[in-house]
Design a protein with these regions (language model features):
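N-terminal "arm"/small-domain region of PLP-dependent enzymes with the aminotransferase-like
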Residues: 1-76, 87, 91, 213-215, ...
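Short, solvent-exposed loop/turn segments at secondary-structure junctions
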Residues: 39-43, 109-110, 138-141, 190-193, ...
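PLP-dependent enzyme catalytic core of the Aspartate aminotransferase-like
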Residues: 83, 87, 91, 95-96, ...
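Amphipathic alpha-helix from the class-I
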Residues: 269-271, 289-311, 325-326
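Conserved glycine-rich beta-strand-loop-beta hairpin in the small C-terminal domain of fold type I
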Residues: 306-320, 332-347
């Protein structure tokens, strides 16, 4: 059987496919595996109780149940949801948006597939454009979504070494140079995998840079503000008519509902909705229906701020303390935890590299993610990307502590301690 170039691109191996395969095998074949690799959110009891209550009420109403189960959404997504979300964004964030500025997708992964291919790839006259990533490491799922080669360009970040075996990445604005072949600038805030949060001043500089080059700034807010608000530092919500913000319900504890949200000026939303209709026909109804109920009852933001954020802040603090204890005396550093649900461990000069360390940990029953695939668009050789691991602390706290102890033991063995 001969397969197309499309099949080679999307049917072959990639970092995100390896990640999801590991997660699937861990659940079905190795159920005792300590899961510190994937992006599944933790279980927040207050959130789960609220979701059961609101979903139950929706399904008990015959008209609402039919609207969820028996009809297709419009191409841009459910009108009531988009209007309710726009009202909240105007009231809470001061964004000048209406329902016409919002589109729904079947998860933010599919949203980025459409967005990146709207702004980058092949253009008239044989020209090609790329997405500029000002700060890598970046989300592993970006790496393979382009329909053409060379979809991403990135450069090394600035690295600030901090006390207590911490460090922090920053945008190296001196080396950041969009050009005529740049179709858009994209950042995640907080950043998956590192937990980095770009400051307001950095976002303002990126916004000005994008405007100066006539290209949009895309902000991946899957972990950010205004929801799910997995932030441990101050960060002002940012949007204007040159910004595309992508939000998600997944990290509220709802990854199974596959609901991504695009907030942009109307012409971008219209183009996105047309492309998304061709690819998906329509989006699922359950996520928007549940989110509308939460918005109508004024529950979405209090849930994020009073339950989701404290849950992850506490988990981050405990995991950071445990990991710092394990790496004491080793040439390792942890990225400053400012948000999201991961610790990013830099094992400087680790013998054999982080992929070999990942394999050894997997053999010992701990699933993490090696760092190499989190550097999309970075062409130049850099040993740093083979020295890092992403660790999730979202799952059962005792198992996370046990996993961190095994990681520490394996690191000491690796360094000959």
């Amino acid at each position: 059987m001969e397969l197309s170039l499309f099949a080679r691109r999307f049917g072959g191996d990639s970092g995100v496919i390896d990640l999801m395969r590991d997660l699937g095998e861990a659940v079905s074949i190795h159920p005792d595996m300590i899961m510190m690799g994937g992006g599944n959110p933790g279980r927040v009891p207050a959130a789960e109780r609220l979701y059961r209550k609101r979903l139950g009420a929706l399904l008990d109403d015959p008209a609402l149940a039919h609207a969820i189960l028996g009809v297709y959404q419009s191409p841009r997504g459910d009108e009531r949801f988009r209007a309710a979300l726009a009202r909240m964004l105007r009231a809470e964030c001061g964004w000048e948006v209406g329902a016409q500025n919002i589109a729904v997708a079947n998860g933010s992964q599919s949203a980025f597939f459409v967005l990146f291919n709207l702004f980058a790839g092949e253009f008239d006259g044989g020209r090609c454009k790329h997405i500029l990533l000002p700060l890598v490491p970046e989300y592993i799922g970006y790496r393979e979504v382009g329909l053409s080669d060379g979809m991403f360009h990135a450069g090394r970040p600035a690295i600030e070494r901090l006390p207590e075996q911490l460090f922090k990445y920053g945008v190296d604005f001196e080396r950041l140079a969009p050009d005529a072949a740049t179709g858009a600038i994209c950042v995640s805030r907080p950043t998956n995998p590192t937990g980095n949060v770009l400051g307001d001043a950095e976002i303002a500089r990126l916004d000005a840079l994008a405007r100066a080059h006539g290209i949009p700034l895309i902000i991946d807010g899957a972990y950010g503000t205004p929801f799910p608000h997995m932030l441990f530092t101050d960060a002002t919500p940012h949007w204007n008519d040159n910004t595309v913000v992508v939000l998600s319900l997944s990290k509220l504890g709802l990854p199974g509902l596959r609901t991504g949200i695009v907030v942009a000026r109307e012409e971008i939303v219209a183009a996105f909705a047309r492309a998304n209709t061709i690819l998906s026909l329509a989006c699922g109804n359950t996520g928007p229906a549940l989110a509308t109920a939460l918005l109508d009852h004024g529950e979405l933001l209090p849930l994020a701020r009073e339950h989701i954020a404290p849950f992850y802040r506490d988990r981050a603090t405990r995991a950071l303390d445990a990991l710092r204890h394990e790496i004491a005396g080793l040439p390792c550093r942890i990225h400053k935890a400012e948000g999201a649900m991961f610790l990013w461990l830099w094992c400087e000069g680790i013998p054999g590299g982080s992929h070999a360390l990942y394999q050894r940990l997997k053999q010992r029953g701990v699933l993490v993610v090696p760092g190499r695939d989190f550097f999309p668009g970075l062409i130049e050789p850099w040993e740093h990307r083979d020295e890092c691991l992403r660790l999730s602390y979202a799952q059962d706290e005792e198992r996370v502590r046990a996993g961190i102890a095994i990681i520490g033991d394996e690191l000491r063995r690796s360094y000959g301690g």
